[in-house]
Amino acid sequence: SKQTIKIQIKMKQNFKLFAALAASAAMMFSCQQAEDPTMDKAQEPIVKTRAYGDKTPKVTIYVETNDVNPLNAGDYMLSDGTAYADIVEFFAANLNKETVNGVVRPTLYLNDKMTNLLENGGAATYVAGLQAKGIKVVLTILPNWQNIDFTSLNDTQADQLATILAYAVNKYGLDGIGFDNEYGGTVTSVSGSYGNLITKLRAKLPAGKLITLFQYNTGGSSQINATAGAKLDYVYSDFAYYNTSISVAGVTKEHYAPMSINLGNYYSAYQISQYGSYAYDLTEAGYGAIMHFNLRRTSERNQLSLFNSIADGAWEETVTCENGNRPQDWTFVPSGYTITYAEATAQ
């Protein structure tokens, strides 16, 4: 029966997990230190890139660019030769504001660490470098304590912000925009603002670009009606093993991640095993995504056992790490960089 098969698979997952844990104890630092045996050309593995639509559930990895090089997210590879991550979110650019002739306009602010990941040719390294492995790169937008957020935009401001975000996607060769509605400060809600912004952004983006949303504490999702929610590609649950409660109207399970993991935490062997079991469950149930937040360098956390447990549960694959310990090797810009509506609409 299917239940018997499921039990057998879970037993196999646990066996593989404990074997992997024993192996990883001996190999903990191999990701950044060990050298592969020398191969001749005939023996060298072929690097493959999987078409984005071929794997489900998708894996999204958020990278805190304030202290981690996003290229580390592309170093984790499945046993079929393709990337473990399907989407990498650069976390985060900020929703700021300016006043023009007495009228408040939204702006997009790249902080000192984010600026040269995208500006001054940075996108050719940090965005295109991930895309070359078949990974979609999304820029997450986060309010910034300026008393403005995605729930407080009038129609004009929503249109201006959507224009700025679509411009940024084009300027930097990004694959989409992600929303996380936290840290807005004191705001006055405008009915339907969040959904209006999503609708306007979808209309301005080329076909195939992504819009994602992290439903942290639901974050204003009550403002998103079913029509707007259906325009989202992926919604990620608040941190959970397996949270099937979708708080955004119009979002189906194929576009939802019930599993969302903070990689900044330490996890026991039992917890790692549980994540593998839930990865199996959500795959069988037809959910569309798994989310990882706050990827760390391998010198800080050994995430390989966790990724292996999830990959085994979801696709019966294993994961290896090519490096994972890349430093912040770009120059910081103290003033950051601001994209205004004027720049986004300049001819």
Protein language model features and the residues they cover:
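Bacterial Sec-dependent N-terminal signal peptides
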Residues: 1-41
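Secreted glycan hydrolases and related glycan-binding modules that recognize and/or cleave
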Residues: 31-347
